[in-house]
A protein has these predicted regions:
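Histidine-dependent nucleotide/RNA phosphoesterase domain, centered on the 2H-phosphoesterase fold
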Residues: 1-195
């Protein structure tokens, strides 16, 4: 049986992608060694599956449709710059999201979908963020740069749909293929066939 890399995520509208691209361009002067996330690949990850069997993927689609069909849209502010594991030894560069409460509720609701499909959720606490870049080594201290941008804000993210993506790794970077789109506020839902 074949398996795929997949993840559940909130997509970003092109305007927000463009605003983030501008931030990435500004940061490149200070963080030249970073690999920046391509704007079209920017998203808010809820759950990632390194390997998921096709049969389980189909169960997950059914569960997501049943649980998320009545979800209401909401907005979060894109605010502040940070890094994992921390700004003193960064590996992942991210933009923060506030308030976190509704995102955490959405994470728990989608976690129910995973359990219904026979999957487990990550045991670490959920930390909503937008990954905008990665560093191969954590030898750069970015704490001063990041502290000067803690109050930085750009346009809000309208959380109005959820997409189940397949992630195909390519030499030029990951390709994200939508498999299922659930529109919030009782709007139409789309099931995609990956090719």
């Amino acid at each position: 049986m074949s398996s795929v890399r997949a993840f559940l995520a909130i997509p970003l509208p092109w305007q927000l992608q463009e605003s983030i691209r501008v931030i990435q361009t500004e940061l490149q002067a200070s963080i030249a060694e970073a690999r920046w996330t391509r704007p079209e690949n920017l998203h808010l990850t809820l759950h990632f599956f390194a390997k998921i069997e096709q049969e389980t993927l189909e169960k997950l689609k059914v569960s997501v449709l049943s649980v998320m069909g009545c979800q209401r849209s909401f907005q979060v502010e894109v605010k502040g710059l940070g890094a994992f594991p921390n700004p003193h030894r960064p590996r992942v560069i991210w933009l923060g999201l506030e308030p976190r409460g509704q995102l955490e509720q959405l994470y728990r609701a989608t976690g129910q979908c995973l359990h219904q499909a026979g999957l487990t959720t990550d045991s670490r606490p959920y930390s909503p963020h937008l990954t905008i870049g990665r560093l191969r080594e954590d030898k750069l201290d970015l704490s001063k740069l990041f502290s000067s941008r803690q109050q930085m804000t750009i346009e809000p993210l309208n959380v109005d749909r959820l997409i189940l993506y397949e992630s195909r790794l390519r030499p030029e970077g990951a390709q994200h293929i939508p498999l299922l789109t659930v529109n919030f506020d009782d709007k139409n839902t789309d099931i995609h066939n990956a090719t």
